[in-house]
């Protein structure tokens, strides 16, 4: 009986050790990712290559996820403006810090600010043509949520030529909420 108890104890300790190793690996991965993220934000802030003008262009509510009466009431022509700074890193990927304000679906002002990153491809012989896929992490505030700061992490995509870029994101959601395509023009100076 004692041998059986010792074996159970050894198996339990082994499992705890394995979980501890996995936890250490996870913590290390998160720490490495955070340092990479914060270094990219810091470098973009301290060493921008361009300054950017943001012009909201389009808001589209997914017709498969909204009632027609809601769509009829929503603003899908956001107007506003914003500014930012950006750089291309040593791998040719875009990094940007931005602040923008625009008229939301209810025609109320919505500010948004954050950091964006895109893996950038230049598939043609013309180096000015590019497209990218990445993410944006930031904060927004909306009138219908009493302008409480709301953190966000959203997909980001773009297509551009030279200094002109058309960037976009999709805000996921539920029925009659979220599920919005939002796009803007970004001009680099």
From Swiss-Prot:
The record marks 175 as: Role in the phospholipid gating. The gene is pagP. It holds the Pfam family PagP. The record marks 70 as: Role in lipopolysaccharide recognition. Transfers a fatty acid residue from the sn-1 position of a phospholipid to the N-linked hydroxyfatty acid chain on the proximal unit of lipid A or its precursors. Residues 1-23 form the signal peptide. GO terms for cellular component: cell outer membrane. The keyword Lipid biosynthesis does not apply. It comes from the Bacteria. It comes from Erwinia amylovora (strain CFBP1430). The active site is at 61, 104, 105. Its EC number is 2.3.1.251. This is Lipid A acyltransferase PagP. GO terms for biological process: lipid A biosynthetic process.
């Amino acid at each position: 009986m004692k041998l059986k108890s010792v074996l159970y104890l050894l198996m339990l300790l082994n499992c705890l050790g394995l979980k501890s190793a996995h936890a250490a690996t996870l913590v290390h991965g998160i720490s490495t990712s955070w340092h990479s993220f914060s270094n990219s934000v810091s470098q973009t802030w301290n060493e921008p290559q361009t300054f950017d003008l943001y012009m909201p262009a389009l808001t589209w509510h997914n017709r498969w996820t909204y009632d027609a009466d809601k769509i009829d009431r929503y603003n899908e022509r956001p107007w506003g403006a914003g500014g930012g700074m950006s750089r291309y890193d040593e791998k040719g990927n875009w990094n940007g810090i931005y602040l923008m304000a625009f008229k939301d679906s209810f025609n109320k002002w919505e500010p948004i600010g954050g950091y964006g990153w895109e893996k950038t491809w230049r598939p043609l012989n013309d180096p000015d043509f590019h497209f990218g896929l990445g993410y944006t992490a930031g904060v927004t505030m909306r009138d219908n949520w009493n302008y409480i700061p709301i953190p966000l992490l959203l997909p980001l995509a773009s297509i551009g030529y030279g200094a002109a870029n058309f960037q976009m994101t999709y805000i996921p959601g539920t029925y009659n909420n979220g599920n919005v395509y939002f796009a803007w023009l970004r001009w680099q100076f």
